[in-house]
Amino acid sequence: MNIHEYQAKEILRKYGVPTSTGVVVTKTESINAAIDKLNTKVYVVKAQIHAGGRGKAGGVKVVKSKEEAKKVAHDMFGINLVTHQTGPQGQKVNRLYIESGCDILKEYYFSVVFDRSASCITFIASTEGGVDIEEVAEKTPEKIIKFSVDPATGLQNFHAQGIAYELGFKDHQVKQMKEIVKATYKAFIETDAAQIEINPLIVNKEGNLLALDAKFTFDDNGLFKHPEIMALRDQDEEDPLETRAADAGLSYVKMDGSIGCMVNGAGLAMATMDIIKLYGATPANFLDVGGGADRERVKEALKIILSDKEVKGILVNIFGGIMRCDIIAEGIIAAAKDIGIKVPLVVRLAGTNVEKGKEILSNSGLEIIPAHDLADAASKIVEAI
């Protein structure tokens, strides 16, 4: 789960991380009054959406008067902001965060993430802040600093001190950076976060460190322990199909292609998406129905896939281990009769009760294209659309 920048900063401040402050606007009628609360010479108007690249897309504006700030805020509120992370459809701006500007002497990048490849928490930092860290990693990887934390010992003083020295801080800034490292680590652990990112972390004209932007991503599996974090959820920022799928117990991620996929198992789902690409098409989604799906869940999965108007065909790829192929077949038929599948449908079944499942599909009277293996299935669905 993601939250907005202003919410992330509020959490960081609770843990002692110094951040820039401002006012939140959730409706246009509040804009003027909110800006009047700020006593500053420079105003920063920020669109609050769950996507990066806001600055390049016009979602962050710096102005030098109240009148300009009010005009920019009114113009920005409600627009559809398109960044490299939103996709071409963009994201509607329903919230603004308006801050007092500050003089920046230097920008840094700082984050703490769970590194799955190393199975530990890792700090990532760079002297190149204020830009996409992926761009820095690609062009100047030597400027990326990493410190991994042994889960057996936890964060140690040398981690914090090492990061401060590697970033080139001196004197009181070393102490400030150490405190920021310790505070973000504590926040990461106690909130069950998957990532905390501060970009940029700046040195202001007084020589002090300040988090100018912040991002939190939380581990969905830990949210049941944190009702206060769940309360920060903004469903307007989430894809409605993904929300609907989650409510149905399905793992669904919308993509930009034309072939809908329904698969059991995340690994098989990714392999299915790969082979669709190999045969020259693009998947419209990732959808894992899970190992214990019943007829109703299969039916709901197909309904969700068909709710995407870009879907021109559907590939069902099921390996029946825990799941029975006859149950899948019955769910497909029920969905087809209920909602009327009008796009090509290719079904590949293997495993438990596979012959029974194939027989059910064959006797259904529906236009279902059978496939005997994954390559055959991918070839047939690409040809059919």
From Swiss-Prot:
It comes from Rickettsia bellii (strain OSU 85-389). Mg(2+) binds at residues 199, 213. Binds 1 Mg(2+) ion per subunit. InterPro entries: ATP-grasp (IPR011761), ATP-grasp_succ-CoA_synth-type (IPR013650), ATP_grasp_subdomain_1 (IPR013815), Succ-CoA_synthase_bsu_CS (IPR017866), SUCC_ACL_C (IPR005811), Succ_CoA_ligase-like_bsu (IPR005809), Succinyl-CoA_synth-like (IPR016102). It is an enzyme of class 6 (ligase). Its cofactor is Mg(2+). This is Succinate--CoA ligase [ADP-forming] subunit beta. SUPFAM superfamilies: Glutathione synthetase ATP-binding domain-like, Succinyl-CoA synthetase domains. PANTHER family: SUCCINATE--COA LIGASE [GDP-FORMING] SUBUNIT BETA, MITOCHONDRIAL, SUCCINYL-COA SYNTHETASE BETA CHAIN.
